[in-house]
C-alpha cells in the first residue's frame, strides 16, 4: 500500500515574516536575522521569498532558512565569514533559545527598480511560532519614507525561555488533556486497574 502526503507550500509570502518592504529603486545588500525559538524544534525550514518590482510570485524562492544564510544541516556552531555567518547559536537544548545569523549580498546584490519585498517562513510553511527580529540593509537611488517604528512593547524581546519553562508548559498541557496514558512522554504514574 502506498501513501502520499501532499503539502501545499506558500509561494505568495502570505503569513511570512517580512524583513524588507522597500519602495523605489535600489539594491538589497544584507540582513541580520534574530530568532528566539520557544521550542527545541529546528526552525530553519522556512523558505525565503523575494518579490521584485511588485511580483505576485517570488522570483527568488529559497529552500530553507539555513540555505538562505549559506549553511545547511541545521548548524549548531558559531562561525563567521565576511558575507555570512552564525554569530550566536544556543547549543544547550536543540534550537531552544536565541540564534543570530547574517548574510550580506555585497558580491551579488539584488537589484530592483520599483520595489522589493523580502519574506521568510517561520518554520516550514509557517508552522512555528517564533519571536523574530531583523535589520535589512539596502542602497536606494532616492530617499524613501520609512514606516513608523512599532511601539516599544512590540520591539522588546520576549523573556528568555528555559528548559524548566518547557516542562511547566508540558505539565499544564498534560493536565488540561486529562493526563491519560496515551499522551506522549507519560511521566505520570497511573494506578493499575484493580
List each model region and its residues:
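Short helix/loop capping segments that flank catalytic or ligand/cofactor-binding pockets
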Residues: 41-42, 60, 148
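TerminUS-proximal long segments
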Residues: 109-193
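Extended extracellular/luminal ectodomain segments enriched in beta-structured repeat modules
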Residues: 23-30, 43, 113
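Extended, compositionally biased non-globular segments
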Residues: 47-142
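A short beta-strand element within beta-rich, extracytoplasmic domains
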Residues: 26-38, 117-122, 194
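Short consensus segments that form the blades of beta-propeller domains
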Residues: 39-41, 128
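Short, small-residue-biased leader/transition segments that mark boundaries at the very start
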Residues: 2-7
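Surface-exposed ligand/attachment interfaces on beta-rich extracellular proteins
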Residues: 11-19
Amino acid at each position: 500500500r502506498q501513501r502520499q502526503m501532499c503539502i501545499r507550500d506558500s509561494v505568495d509570502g502570505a503569513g511570512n515574516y517580512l524583513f524588507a518592504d522597500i519602495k523605489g529603486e535600489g539594491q538589497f545588500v544584507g540582513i541580520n536575522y534574530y530568532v528566539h525559538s520557544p521550542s527545541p524544534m529546528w526552525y530553519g525550514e522556512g523558505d525565503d521569498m523575494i518579490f521584485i518590482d511588485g511580483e505576485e510570485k517570488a522570483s527568488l524562492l529559497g529552500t530553507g532558512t539555513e540555505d538562505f544564510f549559506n549553511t545547511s544541516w541545521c548548524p549548531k556552531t558559531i562561525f563567521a565569514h565576511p558575507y555570512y555567518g552564525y554569530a550566536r547559536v544556543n547549543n544547550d537544548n536543540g534550537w531552544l533559545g536565541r540564534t543570530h545569523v547574517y548574510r550580506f549580498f555585497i558580491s551579488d546584490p539584488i537589484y530592483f527598480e520599483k520595489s522589493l519585498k523580502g519574506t521568510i517562513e517561520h518554520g516550514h510553511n509557517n508552522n512555528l511560532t517564533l519571536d523574530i527580529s531583523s535589520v535589512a540593509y539596502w542602497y536606494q537611488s532616492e530617499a524613501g519614507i520609512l514606516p513608523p517604528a512599532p511601539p516599544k512593547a512590540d520591539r522588546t524581546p520576549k523573556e528568555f525561555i528555559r528548559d524548566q519553562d518547557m516542562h511547566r508548559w508540558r505539565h499544564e498541557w498534560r493536565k488540561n488533556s486529562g493526563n491519560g496514558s496515551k499522551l506522549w512522554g507519560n511521566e505520570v504514574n497511573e494506578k493499575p486497574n484493580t
